[in-house]
Amino acid sequence: VFSAMEQMGEVPFKTVLIHGLVRDDQGRKMSKSLGNGIDPLEVIDKYGADALRYTLITGNAPGNDMRFYWSRVEASRNFANKVWNASRFIMMNDPDNKIKATDERPANLTDADKWILSKMNGLIKEVTDNMEKYELGIAVAKLNDFIWEEFCDWYIEMVKPRLYNDADETKTAAIWTLKTVLIDALKLLHPYMPFITEEIFCNIQDEEESIMISSWPVYDETNNFAAEEKAIETIKEAVRNIRNLRADMNVAPSRKALVYVVTASEDVKNIFNNSLGFFGTLAYASEVKVQADKAGIPEDAVS
């Protein structure tokens, strides 16, 4: 501070974020006498710099000390692998990198595409707000949940049939959506995992110099799709219920099941009729019948 004032005539920074101590897994202060110190270079050699950085940021709540657990570093490494594998999958489906996130939005986006774009749009607003308040742990927890669950476990699985079918007219829309959401996610994640996000970004956005000088994602009202969000969340809930029933009854994934959806609501009927394909891939359904009553449903059917 004194050097900056002397040389530049101004303070080098106006805000300082102070974190607590990093203790060992028993809550003890690290010291030479206890021999419980952790060499960060050893952690980096084993798990990578991003994993260590991510662990230290996510585990350190303001006003509290944190305990260092190797299992948390391993979990951070696993998250980095998840991001890497998802990115690799996306690039494999557009090996020549012809489809860019900067291209004009496709006119034939599906409900699933609009759902993930809307979820990302909300995430951008929340994460930006959290980071402006220096709530780094809260922001990255939301990022983690979105990337791991919404993007990887749900959306990528939803679009796989479209990606594997060259005749599907919405294949390009799926790839555009995948890249658009991934790039925004990489930008939000970059302060936490700078190395892996830089590597992936420069491969997908090869026309840009670096993620470090790219623009921060901005909330966009045109990416709000409330109806599509509601529709896909309804489908997700149904898929979860089917999966839970199958797990409770120890039904093997290879064994397909006939699924009945009983509802008097025309809106709900339309939601399911427009999303029948998801149940084959996500819920191992052989067929889905949407009807207004229980007519024709076997008495031994499970609900």
Give the residues covered by each predicted segment.
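Hydrophobic "lid/gating" helix adjacent to the active-site nucleophile
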Residues: 3-4
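Non-catalytic, structured segments within soluble enzyme domains
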Residues: 54-55, 59
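Transmembrane helix-loop junctions at the membrane interface of multipass transporters and ion channels
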Residues: 62-64
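Feature 926 captures the class I aminoacyl-tRNA synthetase adenylation module centered on the KMSKS loop
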Residues: 7-39, 44-45, 49, 69-303
